[in-house]
């Protein structure tokens, strides 16, 4: 029978339609023939059988319709075998058949396959794949070093198919097995039901072989299996088919976990994390590739088994070394930032290079671009932490354990020495970037309960912060992962041991972790920002001076300025990402609410409305670390300096901050640390609207804050709290308290000025003054009286110091202009320059502060008079005002005429105006005017005449000049009368004179301890500042003083006699 006849017979067979092609049917017949031949060889020859008939059947290859039909029914499995062969070829792209492609049909077989030659030789005549040899075939395929060299065409198509070549010749075996897995999945959806188990088995073979590859990667030459796994995931993320890869990985992971005899699961997977660590550490914040790798890690932190390996992998070699955490995979991620990698080294820094050559708009665009990446970056870190916290109790404990240990190991970042020794600091502790990013992620975790009315917020249990050291098992049971918090100073001393619960909730842990992270990170960076800002200002001034003098140092100074500006812009950008700031503000406002609720004794989960007077129950504050309040203040001050728009857009939440400031600023019972309470005054100054801001032509930049501040319902309590802390910081017990108090009071002056301009606050201040006027003789001097006394003390000291420094500057400037410094050695000249610069800084500080104190006295005296004209305050304020006028308008003013007043914030015109305003405010009181001439040290009629001349010169209003002239005349008349009286009483005996002031006593009193008699006004004034007997330092209060009635009568009799004698002489 000819081939054509055979083909015709087969094609007319109705069963031939079950085959994919005519060639498949012929192949089936060939296989069947081979099997029949094998069966005939195995059976013994029978004499009854006809050898000729069998031989003819085999040799003639008779493809008659009847014979094929009978064979198909008898050997149906042969058809199934063909289909299995084709399916295996389609899935694994391998074959044992290298026959002419023209004899194969293109239907159901891939166009290109890897020919497994060695296996084909081993199997001799079998050129098909089945379920018994497929595993061997896959293994053989995986061992091929270059499968592309073994590709053959399976079809007769002459068209070049690069995709088929690439798929079949895939060299990377992990990627190859994944592709096989995908093709097997596809087959499962297409094959008929009888082939389905075989398709599933092929799918399982891809998984089991992948498991083998991962367990024994050393078998496969030139194959980095773990690199391939990472690259496969990376490609999937970038190609949006990541779910397909993770489905494959899930099954591989499950297979690996079933048998860990060869290698444990962590041993298999740790190389993957090694690769990720190596790649991520070289990436920058603004590189897109970084976020693909983070997505890989996000999957790992969602997958329970990989998450456990990840937590094991990120454990540092030395848990007590804070810097070691930065070297872990999570630490490397947290260290990515726009901050400088090596502090001070701007070379190779990718951000804000040569800022002076960039326009403000270009810098703003770069900043916005970085912020976009930062927001995405922080979201990824947050999701990783959230995944681990939610995945299982084991992973939750693991990540909290890591965070707690990390913070404890880095606790030294806040030490003073750490900032002074950077070379040691960066060997011991993780970086600023690390803590800034960690803080941003933890802030996101806190947002669900960072709402002022959140019931979850009040479930925070402060006793968490005072638990003593626990072992690891106890930490796990109690959910306490922070270490060392019990060594932190709390808001108030503990009176009794707290009752500790069995365990703590996640809100408590999250708040404690986040607040401490901010304390270690954001807080420190803020300090650095302030210093950088100051250094920039100094460099700018020095650079400008060098340019003006054509100094060769100008170029060097410009380079320094450029470098520092790069550091400044990088740091500012890192700290001002809008979403991070908003999240932090939400947390700090919530912390203000929480602390207020603890301060009024609320131990429930629902907030209690604030009311005054405050209740007594506040013992829980003894378990709250001071850094909780310090963070709150520090952040709001930061916003005022570097991101004030957020304060305005979030103004409604600031009322909660005002509640916090009102309660804690004035309450030593609730916040013992006077330094921290003084800082709250700076916080108040930060959040209040500022008078000196230029409003936008379209909308006021302080409108909302002004509304909140003016409508604050507890204005009287806030005013009193501010004045109380002003007084309290006079005596902090700190060895540097004298210098500190001026810095602490600096922000209080603008607050007082703003309060005075608002009706509710001004009336509250006047009420305090009225109370003081009525209780001058109280055992404890009234608050406002002590405040005024300290205010005048400050004014006297500050302006006097400013005058001294200006005089020294004037002398040094004259010496320099005369060329006297040119003859000095370079070192001596540098010392002179440094001295002049130091005097300038000191003069500027004292001038600023004295301007504020005199200005405050100026507006207070406009409506508060009775206290100022009282004898024991009047004398002091008059002597102060006259002394300053003497330097500002008298002959001594020449000594203060430095080159540039503005450089030192010296404002003599404003000072003269304020002093005259005080005089005019109090000049209506006859007693006050009568006291002015008693100032024998500075007062003279000439002084006031000189003052009038200066008022005219500085163009003050005419009505003010006239009023002051009239006041001067009245005082001169009183001075003349007093001079006559003094001449009359000049020979008073020592017994009648005050031992401190050497003036005639009008109200002699006896001090109980020393038994010394002094004038009542003198001792009253002394006790405002120092509640001790001035003669023996024994404790003393006004109620202990007794009038010396007998001496008073003697003085009055003597005065009457002297007066009578004078009248008789006249």
Swiss-Prot record:
SUPFAM superfamilies per record = RING/U-box
Q: Name one GO cellular component term.
A: nucleus
Which residues does this entry mark as bearing N6-acetyllysine?
386
Q: Where in the cell is it found?
A: Cytoplasm
One family name in Pfam for this protein: U-box
Q: Which InterPro entries match?
A: Ub_conjug_fac_E4_core (IPR019474), UBE4 (IPR045132), Ubox_domain (IPR003613), Znf_RING/FYVE/PHD (IPR013083)
Q: Where are the annotated segments for Disordered?
A: 35-57
What is the protein's major site of localization? cytoplasm
Q: Which GO terms describe its biological process?
A: ERAD pathway; protein polyubiquitination; ubiquitin-dependent protein catabolic process
Select a single GO molecular function from the record's annotations and give it.
Answer: ubiquitin-ubiquitin ligase activity
UniProt keyword terms in alphabetical order: Acetylation, Cytoplasm, Transferase, Ubl conjugation pathway
Write out the pathway annotation from the protein's UniProt entry.
Protein modification; protein ubiquitination
**UniProt keyword Cytoplasm present:** yes
Q: Say what the protein does.
A: Ubiquitin-protein ligase that probably functions as an E3 ligase in conjunction with specific E1 and E2 ligases. May also function as an E4 ligase mediating the assembly of polyubiquitin chains on substrates ubiquitinated by another E3 ubiquitin ligase. Mediates 'Lys-48'-linked polyubiquitination of substrates.
Q: Which family does it belong to?
A: Belongs to the ubiquitin conjugation factor E4 family.
Q: What is known of its domains?
A: The U-box domain is required for the ubiquitin protein ligase activity.
This protein is called Ubiquitin conjugation factor E4 A
